[in-house]
């Protein structure tokens, strides 16, 4: 005997029902309400069919009858049908109301899910459109004619200068505050010595404030 492969996928079982009972299970377009107790008829018809089990049939039937397409067909004036497509009586109002409520609830859930997905995807889209700009480090403003700062001069090894020993372009140290500041002599007028400090600042000092 040839072994028949059992169907386990719900979509595959539905496709099998569409093919086996085309007047009852409608694959496309408007469906028709099914007879109450149709599952028992279905189980009996397929009792010798090894392709499907009762459990899988029940799952497939639930999928079919809970689809929006099926719930929309459960309306006033519609006739229930059996496995062969024969009419089995009109729907009761209770069943029509239940189908309408189930359809609305299912559609509301689907809408809420779409809204939630759109909200969660929106920040990512904005981030993708507007790349984050890296902060640009500002360069410190340089004073005109500024030069790299040199190590502070140790005053212990310096001695006060004599005016006669000084001359333009000579590197000297000027006593300003506690620490001497290095610079270059620009000009000498009488007792005033004009010095440009390494910081770029130009000052006039007396010879006694200059250290060598």
Swiss-Prot record:
| GO terms (BP aspect) | post-transcriptional regulation of gene expression
Intracellular or extracellular location(s) = Cytoplasm
> Is Repeat found in the keyword set?
no
Which keywords has UniProt assigned to this entry?
A: Chaperone, Cytoplasm, RNA-binding
Instruction: Specify where the region named Disordered lies, as residue ranges.
Output: 107-153
Q: Name one GO cellular component term.
A: cytosol
Q: Which InterPro entries match?
A: ProQ, ProQ/FinO, ProQ/FinO_sf, ProQ_C
Statement: the UniProt record of this protein carries the keyword S-adenosyl-L-methionine = no
Bias (Basic residues): 127-141
Q: Domain of life of the organism in this record?
A: Bacteria
Query: Which GO molecular function terms does the record list?
Result: RNA strand annealing activity; RNA strand-exchange activity
- SUPFAM superfamilies, per database record: FinO-like
Name the family: Belongs to the ProQ family.
What the protein does?
RNA chaperone with significant RNA binding, RNA strand exchange and RNA duplexing activities.
PANTHER family, alphabetized: RNA CHAPERONE PROQ
Q: What is this protein called?
A: RNA chaperone ProQ
Source taxonomy lineage?
Answer: Bacteria, Pseudomonadati, Pseudomonadota, Gammaproteobacteria, Alteromonadales
Task: Give me the gene this protein comes from.
Answer: proQ
């Amino acid at each position: 005997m040839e072994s028949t492969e059992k169907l386990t996928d719900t979509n595959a079982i539905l496709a099998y029902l569409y093919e086996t009972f085309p007047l009852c299970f409608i694959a496309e377009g408007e469906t028709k309400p099914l007879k109450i107790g149709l599952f028992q008829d279905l189980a009996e018809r397929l009792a010798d069919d090894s392709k499907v089990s009762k459990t899988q049939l029940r799952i497939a039937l639930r999928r079919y009858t809970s689809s929006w397409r099926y719930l929309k067909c459960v309306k006033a004036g519609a006739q229930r049908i059996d496995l062969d497509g024969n009419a089995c009586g009109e729907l009761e109002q209770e069943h029509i109301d239940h189908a309408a409520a189930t359809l609305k609830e299912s559609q509301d859930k689907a809408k809420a899910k779409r809204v939630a997905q759109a909200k969660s995807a929106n920040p990512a889209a904005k981030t993708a459109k507007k790349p984050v700009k890296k902060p640009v480090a500002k360069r410190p403003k340089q004073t005109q004619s500024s030069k790299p700062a040199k190590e502070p001069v140790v005053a212990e090894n310096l001695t006060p200068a004599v005016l006669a020993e000084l001359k333009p372009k000579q590197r000297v140290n000027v006593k300003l505050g506690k620490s001497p500041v290095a610079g270059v002599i620009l000009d000498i007028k009488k007792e005033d010595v004009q010095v440009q400090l390494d910081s770029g600042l130009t000052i006039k000092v007396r010879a006694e404030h200059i250290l060598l």
